[in-house]
Each structure stands twice: as structure tokens, then as C-alpha cells.
């Protein structure tokens, strides 16, 4: 299996969530029994935290309504695009490889004055919003989240709050977010904005990881929030139609008082969902955000893994270490089997193009999703007590989807925790072909746990992931 996983994460969940921690029980080789958690939005945050209190009072009651579409979507595109695509990871002839290419100003300790020269070289004339949306839609993605402003402080939209934006500071003289919003609306793709509310290395008073390195960055953070954050967020929430998601990041210095200034702005978009990175305590938000990792087990809250296709978020010309499409599909399935969403990143070039290796892989993922999307959209975590060694399991109502990554050499697919009676197993890609059961046995460790064995043909229908449907599943 080619998917990325990690030990159980402690990732600072939303105020409404706790990370389930439990010990797996050893069983037969290749089978690990784990208690299946239940999902809820029960308040488990610190009741003395004022940000948590404000969130619960103002947005907690509407959480279930607001996240319904997101739970159905399961798969989205993250876009890290900004003026950092001009140096593309290189500054004064040196590859700045620490962190993603979007961090070049910080990691290269580039002065504000020097960085402000980059927009003059940023003219992404090949940008085509419709093409980008088509790439996402054809890959099976249901929503897009794009960097409206990253930590460098450069706004990728026409902002009246700061001239350091793509419309006023570049020869491009267009608002790509406006064009993207229109293209998304036409294609029925939901659009969200990433906004760096704390770190801002260009505007005085903005925070910086590791501290300021240029006197031009010094200033009052509260004034920065008043003069830059609030007006820009108002612009994003007022001028671009329906905004589905706001994706905050790195809440350095985001005290309860500062959070209290920004939370009311969400009311400009009553249906918007917010991640858990607005405040330093991660006490607010609708969902948790493991980054570049997939939790070993399901979480007790809504969650979304964001991940790159190579080693960087923003475009770095030298980074050609691309994950294969097989890995991307397996990651998507692994995440869905644990009740999460997958936000997969692309880093467009300074010309406005999504790199071809990303496009190629998304086409491959899309081909798989065209046949098997039913096993991802609107599914919930696996109900089985074991993560099978051969793949993953998703569920929708009384239907199970067995995702077979590793085809058994002997043709016998062992499904722990499943007892088939009158249920019929068929291939999702070929519903007319029944998959016969070779019988039901019981675990040698726990006799109450049934193990069904399915007899598979010699070769998989899809070498990446062959999906088998079992309808009429009832929890034992």
C-alpha cells in the first residue's frame, strides 16, 4: 500500500473535538483491532477560554448544518499561488530549500524592500480560471481553497486595504480570485480562501515565525489587524460571491482579544466553515487540520488532511519529487476510511500554469474517481474494528466499499469483522459480476469476531484500487 500515515496525532483539534487515543489489540497477522469511534460535535474545549466560548455561542449551533456539503465532498484542491512563484525557490542564485517555496522571504531573510520588487516581475498571463476549475472538477474534487494572502503579505486579489496586491503592484492588472469565483460558480465547485491572519512579513506589525529580521516589519499587531486583516477579510467575504471555506493559518500571537475582532466577520458569510487555525489555542473552528500527515485512527471531530504532491506548497522549480497517482488515490481512500477530507495541493507557476506533473496525476486520479467516486463521496469511516492489511473500507448507509490495494496472490480476500448472510458482493466497476464468498470463520483471538473470505479473480479490475460493494451491511 502506498499511502502516507503517521502515529496517532495530537494536532490541536477544534473546541468541539477530542483526539481519540486508544491501544490497538494484537490479533492475527495483518489484522489490528481498534475500537471504532463515534463522531460528534460535543463541546470538549476549555470552558474558561473566551475564544472557545465566543465560538460555541455564535457558531457552534450551526456547525452541523454548515458542514453537510463538506462531509459529502471529501476531496478538494488546495492552491498555493503568489508572488513567491517568481523566485521559485531561488534567491540570488541560492536554492532556499528550508520549508516550502512560499516561505522564501522568511527563510532567505529577504528585506521588505527587496521582496517588494518581485511584483514587477509577476505577470501570469497564462492564468485561466476556467482551466484550473476544470482540472479540479475532472479530478473529482468538489471544492477549491486558494491562498488569498500568504505569510508574505501579498494579496492575490484587488484590495483597497493595501497596495501590495496583484492588481495594483503587478503588470497583470487583473483579479484572479474574482475570475476564479466566477468559474467555480459556473462549474458548481465551491470556493474557499486561505488567509494568513497573523504572519505577515510585509506589513508593519504582522507576526513572523522566528521574529522580525527587518525594521520595516516592526509595528503594532493590533493596528495591523485593524488596518489590514479586518478590511481585507471584509473584502473577501463581500466581493467574491459565496465563500464556502476560510482557511486560517499559523496563529502566532493571536490572543483572545485579537480573535474576538475577526470572529464576527464570519457572519458576512452565514454558511462559511472555518478551520481550527484562527487562534493560538486552536479553540475555535469547524474542523481539525493535520498537515502532511494522515492520522492512524479516526478522529472524534470533522477533520481534513492537507498535503502536497511533491515537497513544497508554493512552486519550486527544482522540486520534481512527485508522488505517483497510486499514492494519491490511496491517501484519499485512507483518509475517507477514517472520516476525513483530503485537500490536495497544487503550486502554480509565475506564468499562471499548474505544473504539468500535477495535471497528469490529477487526470489519473480523476479517471479512478470517475468509476469509483461513489465509494468516496458522502462516505463515513469504516465500521469494521480492523484496518485490513490489503486496503481500506468506507461506508455509506448500509453499503460497504472494500478498497483492495494489494491483490491477494491466492485470490482469497480476508475481511475481518464482516459476516455475510444474504448480502451480495459485486465490483463497483462491474456490478454484474458477483464476488463469491468462500465462507465465514471466526477470529482465533476473539470468537465473537467474524471473518469473511471473498474469492477474487486472478487479476484486479484496477491495479491502483479495485472496489467491491457489499449492500445490506449490518453492524455486528
Task: Give names to the regions the model predicted.
Residues 1-3, 25, 453:
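Generic N-terminal simple sequence motifs
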Residues 1-12:
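Bacterial N-terminal signal peptides that target proteins for export
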Residues 15-16, 64:
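Helix-centric, low-specificity signal for extended rod-like, repetitive segments
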Residues 27-476:
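Mature catalytic domains of secreted/periplasmic carbohydrate-active enzymes
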Residues 17-24:
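C-terminal segment of classical bacterial N-terminal signal peptides
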Amino acid at each position: 500500500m502506498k499511502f502516507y500515515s503517521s502515529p496517532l496525532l495530537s494536532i490541536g483539534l477544534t473546541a468541539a473535538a477530542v483526539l481519540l487515543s486508544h491501544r490497538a489489540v494484537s490479533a492475527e497477522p495483518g489484522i489490528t483491532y481498534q475500537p471504532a469511534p463515534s463522531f460528534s460535535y460535543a463541546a470538549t474545549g476549555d470552558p474558561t477560554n473566551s475564544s472557545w466560548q465566543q465560538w460555541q455561542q455564535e457558531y457552534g449551533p450551526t456547525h452541523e448544518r454548515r458542514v453537510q456539503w463538506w462531509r459529502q465532498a471529501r476531496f478538494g484542491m488546495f492552491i498555493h499561488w503568489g508572488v513567491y512563484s517568481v523566485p521559485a525557490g531561488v534567491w540570488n542564485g541560492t536554492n532556499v530549500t528550508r520549508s516550502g517555496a512560499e516561505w522564501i522571504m522568511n527563510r532567505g531573510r529577504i528585506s521588505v524592500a527587496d521582496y517588494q520588487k518581485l511584483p514587477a516581475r509577476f505577470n501570469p498571463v497564462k492564468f485561466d480560471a476556467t482551466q484550473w476549475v476544470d482540472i479540479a472538477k475532472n479530478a473529482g474534487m468538489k471544492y477549491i481553497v486558494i491562498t488569498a494572502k500568504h505569510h508574505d503579505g501579498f494579496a492575490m486579489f484587488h484590495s483597497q486595504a493595501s497596495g501590495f496586491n496583484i492588481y495594483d503592484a503587478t503588470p497583470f492588472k487583473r483579479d484572479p480570485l474574482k475570475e476564479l469565483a466566477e468559474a467555480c460558480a459556473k462549474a458548481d465547485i465551491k470556493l474557499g480562501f486561505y488567509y494568513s491572519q497573523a504572519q505577515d512579513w510585509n506589513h508593519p506589525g504582522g507576526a513572523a515565525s522566528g521574529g522580525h529580521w527587518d525594521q520595516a516589519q516592526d509595528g503594532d499587531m493590533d493596528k495591523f489587524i485593524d488596518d489590514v486583516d479586518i478590511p481585507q477579510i471584509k473584502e473577501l467575504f463581500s466581493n467574491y460571491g459565496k465563500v464556502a471555506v476560510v482557511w486560517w493559518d499559523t496563529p502566532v500571537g493571536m490572543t483572545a482579544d485579537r480573535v474576538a475582532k475577526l470572529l464576527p466577520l464570519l457572519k458576512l458569510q452565514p454558511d462559511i466553515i472555518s478551520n481550527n487555525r484562527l487562534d493560538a489555542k486552536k479553540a475555535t473552528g469547524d474542523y481539525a487540520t493535520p498537515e502532511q500527515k494522515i492520522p492512524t485512527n479516526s478522529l472524534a471531530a470533522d477533520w481534513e488532511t492537507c498535503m502536497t504532491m511533491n515537497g513544497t506548497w508554493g512552486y519550486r522549480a527544482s522540486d520534481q519529487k512527485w508522488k505517483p497517482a497510486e499514492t494519491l488515490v490511496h491517501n484519499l481512500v485512507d483518509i475517507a476510511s477514517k472520516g476525513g477530507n483530503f485537500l490536495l495541493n497544487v503550486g502554480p507557476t509565475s506564468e499562471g500554469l499548474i505544473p504539468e506533473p500535477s495535471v497528469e496525476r490529477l487526470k489519473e486520479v480523476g479517471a479512478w474517481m470517475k468509476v469509483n467516486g461513489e465509494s468516496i463521496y458522502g462516505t463515513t469511516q469504516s465500521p469494521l474494528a480492523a484496518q485490513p492489511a490489503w486496503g481500506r473500507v468506507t461506508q455509506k448507509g448500509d453499503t460497504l466499499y472494500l478498497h483492495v490495494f494489494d491483490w491477494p496472490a491466492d485470490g482469497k480476500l480476508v475481511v475481518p469483522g464482516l459476516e455475510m448472510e444474504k448480502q451480495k458482493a459485486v465490483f463497483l466497476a462491474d456490478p454484474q459480476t458477483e464476488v463469491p464468498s468462500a465462507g465465514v470463520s471466526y477470529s482465533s483471538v476473539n470468537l465473537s469476531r467474524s471473518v469473511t473470505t471473498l474469492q477474487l479473480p486472478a487479476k484486479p479490475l484496477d491495479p491502483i484500487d479495485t472496489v467491491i460493494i457489499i449492500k445490506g451491511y449490518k453492524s455486528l
